[in-house]
């Protein structure tokens, strides 16, 4: 199961709210910051570069509340090159309109988007494993 950091905002970096964390788990992922997900207000879910580096997410999903997620800005953060998601290129966007508003869209479209990202990650891992096995 991939560890997922869901970034709701970039400056300051804010991790995902509770229902997003639940959708990550339902989709087959592991929430990178489960303790923060239970906190309702955004200021209580602020994380630092060091927090994200220590969490070592396999996938980073950005949903920057109405502005476009820019993977390059995430990749340029100090120390982020050592994070598996950044090293392996697993930075994805989910539009905030389908994930950050509680209700039917989050439960259908938002969940489906997370499931697709998790499935892509699993397929990539399986292909890498098969390639490694073929070399031995």
Give the positions of each predicted feature.
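Binding-cleft/active-site segments that stabilize strongly anionic ligands or cofactors
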Residues: 1-108, 112, 120-134
């Amino acid at each position: 199961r991939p560890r997922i950091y869901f970034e709701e905002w970039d400056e300051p970096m804010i991790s995902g709210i509770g229902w997003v964390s639940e959708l990550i788990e339902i989709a087959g992922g592991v929430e990178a910051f489960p303790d923060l997900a239970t906190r309702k207000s955004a200021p209580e879910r602020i994380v630092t570069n060091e927090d994200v580096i220590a969490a070592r997410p396999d996938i980073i999903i950005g949903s920057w509340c109405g502005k476009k997620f820019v993977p390059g800005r995430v990749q340029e953060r100090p120390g982020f090159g050592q994070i598996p998601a950044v090293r392996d290129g697993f930075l994805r966007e989910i539009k905030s309109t389908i994930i950050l508003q509680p209700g039917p869209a989050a439960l259908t479209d938002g969940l489906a988007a997370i499931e697709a990202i998790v499935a892509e990650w699993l397929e990539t891992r399986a292909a890498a494993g098969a390639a490694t096995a073929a070399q031995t």
